[in-house]
Swiss-Prot record:
Protein name, entry field: Cytochrome c biogenesis protein CcsA
InterPro entries: Cyt_c_assembly, Cyt_c_biogenesis_CcsA, Cyt_c_biogenesis_CcsA/CcmC
PANTHER family reported for this sequence: CYTOCHROME B_B6 PROTEIN-RELATED, HEME EXPORTER PROTEIN C
GO molecular function, one term: heme binding
Task of the protein: Required during biogenesis of c-type cytochromes (cytochrome c6 and cytochrome f) at the step of heme attachment.
Source species of the chain: Nuphar advena
Gene name, Swiss-Prot/TrEMBL: ccsA
Amino acid sequence: MIFATLEHILTHISFSIISIVIPTHLMTSVYEIVGLCDLSEKGMIATFFCITGLLVTRWIYSGHVPLSDLYESLMFLSWSFSFIHIVPYFRNYKNYFSTITAPSAILTQGFATSGLLTKMHQSAILVPALQSRWLMMHVSMMLLSYAALLCGSLLSITLLVITFRRNIDIIGKTNHLLISSFSFDEIQYLNVSFRNYHRYQLTQRLDHWSYRVIGLGFTLLTIGILSGAVWANEAWGSYWNWDPKETWAFITWTVFAIYSHTRTNKSLQGANSAIVASIGFLIIWICYFGVNLLGRGLHSYGSFTLNI
């Protein structure tokens, strides 16, 4: 009872903190207030430790790693987003993930604590299929890979939006320059060039970090799939069964393998590889969440009960 109460308290504290962090971060993005920026980063650190405490508490009183159902996997996914958020802070890097990770963490945690998953808030005994030492290895790797791939894909989507807007601005400004006076043309040209240079720098940085994060996520996804294959062989006598979850995991892996190939090809870098990553964003959600709603297979343990 004490552990359940502590888990409940930590859930509400983490959700409340991150609810304050998001508008604070938006204010710092607009007004560049250093104090508020530092406050929002510390808020995400506090959120990370609250969710960590929540998962550890649930682990202690349930007797098994908290990765057995959709509620627990969503809380772990929220923890993963928080972890990705605070890594640049401790390594003194400019945080390009902040506008992505904080909303992602609150949305996943918000859905996890919603009325749809109320029955799963109380920990239950593991079903026989999940009573394996491979549970922690396989599911944690898959969820960490989802978090990394989602963040990298969102950076790629941001890159596409900036590139698309830049192209529109260039076309609009070019047409305007053709009908303007010569002296005004020079001023406009310098302004457009200056803005485009900074946008170019931003897109290059987004492309760089997107590639690094997706590369990490792809590695974790590969480890997760391989460990799942070993577990499947122990549980069902076959390394691969082509059930809906496994099929979509393979599709996800293939999409990001294609991304890795396009990203290493100089002629396909930038917008082309970002389009592939954007497609991957949708594929991940189908693999993680949609398959259990639309399909049945060895990984489906009833509606809203398991998603690994």
